[in-house]
């Protein structure tokens, strides 16, 4: 979804659902994608996914709601204090509105939604960032993913997968960023 490859959506969306991704998880993944790959990409995916859900008999009642209880911060975003400090120091001086939406919408809402396990949300985010060539923020999100239980092997597989769907250049950028994170962890930093 990060690259808006709409012609491939029906095949891959069905494959994901046939492989055990639940309709609720997929719906939540599309919502999450909107924040990292842009709303137009998510809207395109949602249209295709609605058709697939209709074919499979998935009802709106089967999908996550806005009113769901939220996960505690220490579970959803274990590095939230560091994240908030970074946003206050580096984003707020340029855009208080972006700080507001980042804190109150992205983190206080989206990252706390229970329809995706925190480790799965973190892995999806690093996959999106890799496919979009967003290597500047990749280390922060990768560190969170590793903290939430994503393994280095899973990261390696995701990076290899990214090469085919996001392009080799983006996958290599993300691999270099991942190596830096791994090296820092190995050094005890």
Identify the role of each PLM range.
Residues 7-8, 23, 33-36:
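Structured binding/interaction patches within domain cores
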